[in-house]
Amino acid sequence: MRIINLIVVHCTATQGNRTLSPEALDLMHRRRGFNGTGYHYYIRKDGTVHLTRPVERIGAHAKGFNASSIGICYEGGLDCRGRPADTRTPEQRATLRLLIHQLLEDRKSTRLN
């Protein structure tokens, strides 16, 4: 079991009025030279959470911190004009809160960033 001491939350940096399937996210990462999705969890707008990389496999989401972190990504992050915005839906917020709580319970020495 690898030592996890950090949870990093990301967004897909896609417009909030567009959708991005887990498969499309995986393809985006592969086109950038990664071996699949770099995040461990992906939260869709409806609050559905997808395991996109096993937690025991080192992520590719936060250079310099991948070996000791878990990456969570939510769909969205840009407004309809492409500017950074908090586009999280109530469902995404609830799922994110629950997922982080579960991860922190499982790994008492982990911090959120």
Language-model features and meaning:
Residues 2-109:
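Active-site-adjacent loop/helix surface patches within enzyme catalytic domains
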Residues 112-113:
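Single conserved hydrophobic/aromatic residue that forms the stacking wall/gate
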